[in-house]
Every structure is written in C-alpha cells, then in structure tokens.
C-alpha cells in the first residue's frame, strides 16, 4: 500500500515510517525539517519525502502533485502533523501562537483532506487517519489552544465521516500518552515514564494498517 503521512520528521510520524516500510508499504511523507527529510530519503530510498508546510495550501498542493508523480495515489492518508503551545494559561498565550496552532493542527488537516480525499473518491477506496489526542476528548490546564484544536479534529472527523461514500473512511485516532518532544514540552521529566514513540509504533502501525472503511467515523485509541 501507499501511505501518505504528514509530520514524518519527528515524534510519532518518524517512528511509524520504518514500521510501515518493514511491512512492505511505501511511505510518502512530508515535514518541515529538511535535514531529517534528507536522512529519511537516504534510509528509505524506495519511499518519497518532501518539505511541506501543511498550513500553507500552496505548499500542500505542490507536495500532492510531486507525490503523485513520484509514488502514486494514496491508500492511506495519515494527518499527523501538529504542534503544541508553550504551557501557559489561555490569557497568556499570544494571538500569534494561538493562530499558529490552529493553522497547523486544523487548517493543515483540512488542506490535506481537500487535496487528497478527491483522489480516494476517484478510486472509490481509501482511509484517512486524523491523529487526535486524549486532549481532544478531555482537557487540561495550560494547553487550552492544543485542546481546542484536537477537539476540533474530533468534530471535523465525525462530520467528514458522514460525507464520505461507503468505500472511503475516516477515523480520529488518539495515540495515547507517548514520550515525545511535545509531551516533554508539557510535562518535562515526567514524560520519561511513558513509552517511547518507537515502542508505541511497533503496535500502532499494524493497528493503523488494519483499519478499513467499516471503521468510518469511529473515535479510536491506539493500543
């Protein structure tokens, strides 16, 4: 299968790449860290990696066009790219930082869907995986902007599921609590007590690959 994934240069996305490849799939990935993208290209020469800012629709359009030429149409789209705010009460979060989160975490998902789902509709086949969060189903102090964006993804996913035909599906996937740079930013050393992204990916990858349009609309949590 051909798996398109955003945010592949670090965290959960970076950890999923080798797991998918080892299972015989082609990864088409994007991110903003060009050094890591080059490393990925060298490590996985049969895959395709390209710089892309998902919050910029023009950048997304360029990525989609190049990916189609280099790798082919997607069986899966994994909307993984996301950022978190510096922990602070909402009234101390600047408008610039708040807008940055919504641009990446919400607009970025919508931009990818806008350009990729029509390909799936044409093929009458495909799965969209929108990475959510436990903070998209609950809340916590000092991360209100992040919570807001992930609650938005849950609603977006539910509405999208009602718009798709029978053979195309979408799910909102809560990865669980994983020791990534984002969690360290929020929790500091406490994050070290949780599983690494690499450990998580060994069970998350087969779980994701097992999702089908029969799961359409479900709010799921990775094992």
Placement of each model-derived feature along the sequence:
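C-terminal helical subdomain
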Residues: 166-168, 172-173, 180, 189-223
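Conserved glycine-rich Rossmann-like NAD(P)H-binding loop of the short-chain dehydrogenase/reductase
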Residues: 23-39
